[in-house]
Amino acid sequence: PDYATDLDLVSSTDSELPTVTCPETIPNCGRKRLHGDHTPADQIVGAGAGDFPVWSNFGAPVFNSWPTWRSTNHQQVYWKWLERAWRGGMRLMTMLAVTNEFACGSANRLRGTDCRKSMPAIDKQLDAAYAFQSWLDSKSGGSGSGWFRIVKTPDEAEQIIRVGKLAVVLGIEVDTLFGCKQTNTCTPDFVAGEVDRYYEKGVRHIYPIHDFDGGFGGSALFNGFLGAANVTIEGAPFISQPCPGMSDDGTLNCNVQGLTGLGASLIRKLMNKGMLIDIDHMSAKAVDETIALAKQHGNYPLMVGHGLFNEVHASGHTRHERMRTAAQLEQLHSLGSSVSVMTQDEIKDDPRCLHSSVTFKRSYEYAVSKLGGSAVAAIPFGSDFNGIVRHVGPRYGDGACDNNAAQRAAEANRPRLQYPFTIPGFGRFDKQVTGQRTFDFNTDGL
């Protein structure tokens, strides 16, 4: 249960946490509370991302309020749910090791954790991916027998997919990759060595830049909160400039920082290793510079791991620098890049059903049209599960259409997903039951 835990936690200030009294409904919940009730009075990780209502802190087996399509601070990828996706036909995924120095420093955490050093947490997550693979193997008959297989080459991925298993690509999405900040002295030789080291660990997918400016370049501006956090992490605010048509978000606009010299060196090294380079958190200037380097390197394909699209959104403080423009998509398509559609959308003007499969379809069809049409376009979905974002909301029930009453009433008369349903070639599926909770896509969303 998420109410409390027996892990050795300390507070965000490294002080002792009080021992809790477990509720009668969960008699053995643990000794220390992970977080409060998601109210504004609680720590930033509990309240800052909108996980409401109060009393949503019970996890397994009750699941009284989370996970939901809008919950952002809780585990959304329990292994049985991942298995269901595989059984339903998913055959390739990226498993990203992720951490955020600012969020780590704002939350209860394991004793001894140094939030200023991100890579040890990344190492632990990569090791855990291999341990998870071994654990599944042990449940399936021994080494290599499980349905979850970490792959390191396209040929390996194809072989795994052909035998009906899930091919898993390991990746890293972190704000301070290799510990390289603007204020330290990482060298090209050090960075090249780190790329080699993580390549040997099986990593093939890299975000050179994430939420903050760093040693490799400028971050896309899309959230005012991150500007304040950038001061804490990098010691300086973002410096922005107007970029009409790309960002309407007031003073946020676009980052003046592109790739640093070290960043350009990293991009070249990643291309030489044949790794996936994800541009999705880069500033527009860094994106342009990375595309230019890719063209110089024989039209090297790039990656958009959780795509949002500028033209899908109306102007008026809804578009921002992390959204891909039509011009960027044209260049990415010419390189043979992979561009995903994020399961969170920020569309605020849909006339039918906000933040639902309707708006996801709108973004998906736009991506297909820009990337070669339905005959050739292969569009992944970018879930960003556990990435402090929402997902595809429900079309029916109390919270449908992002609580838009008129849309909810109109949608109620439209056909629903009928359970059980059959996916040709993959079998028959009823509602997902986990613990004491039965999930229904119609009323729960993704």
What are these regions, as identified by a protein language model?
Residues P1-N253, G261-R268, N272, V287, ...:
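N-terminal hydrophobic targeting/anchoring segments and the immediately downstream early-domain regions
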Residues L276-I279:
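Short catalytic-loop micro-motif centered on adjacent basic/acidic residues
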